[in-house]
Amino acid sequence: MASLRKTHPLLKIVNDALVDLPTPINISTWWNFGSLLGLCLIAQILTGLFLAMHYTADIATAFSSVAHICRDVNYGWLIRNFHANGASFFFICLYLHVGRGLYYGSYLYKETWNIGVVLLLLVMMTAFVGYVLPWGQMSFWGATVITNLLSAVPYVGNTLVQWIWGGFSVDNATLTRFFAFHFLFPFIIAAMVILHLLFLHETGSSNPTGISSNADKIPFHPYFTYKDLFGFVILLLALSVLALFSPNLLGDPDNFIPANPLVTPPHIKPEWYFLFAYAILRSIPNKLGGVLALLASILILMVVPLLHTSKQRGLMFRPLTQILFWTLVADVAILTWIGGMPVEHPFITVGQVASVLYFALFLIFIPATGWAENKALKWN
C-alpha cells in the first residue's frame, strides 16, 4: 500500500515539493537562499502579527505605541528587534538569491524569474510602508519624499499623490492606509511564493554547471532538508546576534525623534537596502528622469533573459563575464555607499558614473561579452 504522503491530495503536493522532489546532486550553498527567504517571510509574518496586536495606527499614538511595545509588552523589545532586523536579513537573502540567479543563468526559467522580480518589488513596497509605521522623523520624511516622487507623473501626478496621501500632506489617513498595506502585502507575497515554486517545479532547479542534471538527481529529503536546516540555524544565529547585541546598528538615529512636519532632518535617506536605488534616483537632475531610472534599476532584471547572448547558461566557465558580474556587484556596493552620502562633490559624480555603469553592464557589456565568448569558442 502506498504511503499516505503519496496518496492524500494535500500531502501529495507537500511531498512533491519537499520530500520526493528530484534535486540536482551538485547544487551549492547558493541554492539555500530560497528556503532562507521562506524562513524570513514566516518569521516576519509571525513577529509582525504580534506587533500588530499592540500597535496603534494613529499619528497621535503610533510612536508611543512602539515605545510601549518595547518597554511594557512581554518580550516586546525582542519581537520588535527581530522584526526590524529580520527585514535587513530578508533583503540580504533576496539580493544574494537574485545574484545567484544572475550568475548561474537561473533567469532562463522566464516565468519563475519574472514572478521573482514581482516578488522583489512587493517586498520592497512592504518594507517601505513598514518603515513609515513607527512615525519617527525618518519615517515621516521618507514617506513624504518617496510618495512625492509620483507627482512627476505627467498630467495626473499631483492628483495621484494626494490620492495616496488621503489629503494634502502625509497625515493620519496616510499612516492608517500604510498600516493596512503593510498587513496585507505579506499574504500576497506568500501567495506569489507558491506560484514562484509552482513554476520552478515545472522545470526543476538549475545547477552550477548550467547543463542538464536529469541523469544525476537525488530526493530532496533527507539530503537538502538537512542542508536547508543548517542554513536556518546559521541565519537565526546571525539574526539573534544582531537583534540582541546591536539592534539599532542598521537603523537611523533620527527615527528615535517623533515625526515633526516642521523640522526636516539634515539627510533624508531610506534604510540601507534601498540606498543603491536611491543613489540612482538622485544621480539624475530631472525629477521624472530620476523616477524612471529608479523603476528601471529594478525592472531591468525582467529584460535580463532577453539579453542573454551566450550559448552557455551560467558563468561557471565564462571568465570574462565573471569579471563583469563582480564589477556589477562592486558597482551596487558603491551605489549603496553613495546613497547614504550627502549630495555634494565628489559623491554626485561618483553616483552618476556608477549609475551609468549599472545600466551599461546589463544592457551592453554583459550581452556583448557573451557574444564575444561564443565567437572565441567558434559557437556562433
Curated annotation (Swiss-Prot):
The chain crosses the membrane at residues 33-53, 77-98, 113-133, 178-198, 226-246, 288-308, 320-340, 347-367. One of its GO terms (cellular component) is mitochondrial inner membrane. Belongs to the cytochrome b family. GO terms for biological process: mitochondrial electron transport, ubiquinol to cytochrome c. It is a multi-pass membrane protein. A ubiquinone binds at H201. Heme b b562 binds at H83, H182. Pfam families: Cytochrom_B_C (PF00032), Cytochrome_B (PF00033). This is Cytochrome b. Heme 1 (or BL or b562) is low-potential and absorbs at about 562 nm, and heme 2 (or BH or b566) is high-potential and absorbs at about 566 nm. Component of the ubiquinol-cytochrome c reductase complex (complex III or cytochrome b-c1 complex) that is part of the mitochondrial respiratory chain. The b-c1 complex mediates electron transfer from ubiquinol to cytochrome c. Contributes to the generation of a proton gradient across the mitochondrial membrane that is then used for ATP synthesis. Binds 2 heme b groups non-covalently. Its main location: mitochondrion. It is found in: Mitochondrion inner membrane. One of its GO terms (molecular function) is ubiquinol-cytochrome-c reductase activity. The gene is mt-cyb. Its cofactor is heme b. Keywords: Electron transport, Heme, Iron, Membrane, Metal-binding, Mitochondrion, Mitochondrion inner membrane, Respiratory chain, Transmembrane, Transmembrane helix, Transport, Ubiquinone. Heme b b566 binds at H97, H196. The cytochrome bc1 complex contains 3 respiratory subunits (MT-CYB, CYC1 and UQCRFS1), 2 core proteins (UQCRC1 and UQCRC2) and probably 6 low-molecular weight proteins.
